[in-house]
């Protein structure tokens, strides 16, 4: 521990409030421990700048692009109270310890704290790889100064992302749609997903056939084998076909269904024999300990966690002292961790399960940063999952168990055994030679598999690689006779490339060296929130809007969605972090162009974009004469008008909405024609409403099938008669006011029930649907009770009090008495008996009120009783932490009242204006982005 300060007190600042209690317990009364709650300063929105700066070189980005990209900082509105509190505490201590995280973001937070607090006492920088007593004690022995190179790298990244987004996003708004955004990593991630969907759209399936057989030995043991060759030529499998359905090799036999069935029949009575037996030793090594990237991948495979949930749960485990720091590219373990893992493996599984020498691993990541250890259980002796089960939530326990197993297994012995490969064959009655193959692996020593086995991603091949699967074959020798008990011809179809899952997208981004694994969760959440991607059955499906965005970026901003270029930017940021590259020169090359490589800068590209044909950008050819267009209200199909051969007149184009649940690769030429045919129709006429005389039709719309009434438009004569009947009103000057035309009547519309079908729905069904809401009657106080169908299903309504009912069919059968019985039960909603909160997350440091998650009309939302914010679609209630809730509420406050404050008030925490020099000084202006989750 450090030497005591003069008055026995020192202030230690961490990032997260959840660390405070744990660290305070280790340090005792000599220290005041507090948190900054993430970043305290950031670049403001340009609209929030003081008036005198809005029109200058700072006005566009809140960065002075003419003065070495000097950033203009303000203290975040929701952090002013926290900064004031830290300043008060700093007056009562004799030393300041900045213990924010040890990555770029954490280093920047420490720098900003020092700049804003302006301490007059000694300042020490320290980091904790884990929140344990031992780690904290070691950290006090490794105190250092703030690493200004790391701060430079973070500042460069923040300015880079600001410039990238602010220059390119407005182009998307003008040419594709409002509310869209471009980002250095998010745009590349979106391109990956779109490119995979393009591959699926262009894919042509190929059919191929083979034979499978069940064979019996003379000792009556059975095993399965598969046809691999006919007349000495290998039989084609899925890997032999290109994505256009053609064979990639002429040296294979492509069996048709007829050939396969004929061969199976001809082999029915043929005598089979073993032609060769080959046995090889089998060895499998354990996987390396977790990095940030591999943890997200494996948690997605094994636990079905999204990347964001994984990082949130890992953050809680780290801050509570259960695991080491969770943002790392390193696969290395410290000496004490290796000893702990080997010792525990030996105790749990036996000494034979631990190799004689410790295992070491090398990173495979393209841009790995080895500053931290791999993710592992905290401490010099690991707690088993059973030992911590009672103190962790279910998600925390499952992730801890995964990390513990992976860490232990990484220091265990190889799994060993043997793999046997057998070839057997026969001559068919039609003279053709058929050869079958079978293989089996027998694991004689499980080694690390006793603790853990790594998951795998889905592949596109039907014949998935099963080399690690354990399967035993009977004892066989060359020449042994076999009987074919069962032979079957089997048809197969090649599969398109699988869509990305969160796990495989994270893996690809990591392998390409794009972005940092610690930001992948936020990147994936962003592309979901922007509507570029949605999750369907675990796969990432791009929207048609994403197609338009990617096409625009590829054609007008090609380098900025290029994988190699984006990866190189990440390498350059690493060089800046190591002090090998100047941030000012690098940003100048990026924005203005030039440099050693004569790069074309972003500014000249934007300044010389020329005319971008928005219609062309938002058009995707589906088939000859059929185009999908991304419109203001969603995607739709358009077919070219046809020419009347007799008159030469061209008909208007035919249009049809595209269902929201139809994936891009499912919109084939045939499907497009089907939708257009439906679009030509005004709907299926069901009959006439006897009450109104209006025609009732059933249609298929973008959001599913529905029924509606056709209300004839008023004729010019009717409109004029209406206007003539209206009294004339006059302006004050005596001139008559123009009369307003009547508003068109709005037709009644109702979605079909889930149990109904567009082709069979009747007029009676339609009239019932259009009659909703149905009035059941009134209660004893005279309040009307109705029943209707809504977004979340059928429900009763009495004033503001709504109650769900069982099924859609009950809408037409439920009685007033049954409704009154439901209302007589304890209320689950409404003011009189509010539903308990879905979650309680602690006290908000800004409002000092309890934060809860409630169920609202439009879904769950977070509130402290003053500020409300909807739970983001990319997050779950279970994954929300106190820190995340505080962050979301702070963001909402910043977007609301904070913007209405006079701009001058936001300049109080402006960064120091000292210009950067070659030799870094503590007064050098720097910035900070929102801390990554």
Task: Please describe what each predicted stretch is.
Residues 101, 296-298, 302-306:
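A conserved hydrophobic secondary-structure block that centers on an alpha-helix together
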Residues 263, 267-288, 293, 299, ...:
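Pre-Walker A segment
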Residues 175-179, 194-255, 302, 326:
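C-terminal helical "lid" subdomain and adjoining coupling/linker elements of P-loop NTPases
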Residues 84, 91, 131-215, 279-283:
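C-terminal or mid-to-C-terminal helical accessory/interaction module adjacent to the motor/catalytic core
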Residues 2-11, 21-22, 29, 146, ...:
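Basic, low-complexity terminal or inter-domain segments flanking catalytic cores
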Residues 17-20, 37-43, 102-106, 129-134, ...:
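Conserved nucleotide-binding/hydrolysis micro-motifs of P-loop NTPases
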Residues 1-158, 167, 172, 241, ...:
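Intrinsically disordered, low-complexity regulatory segments
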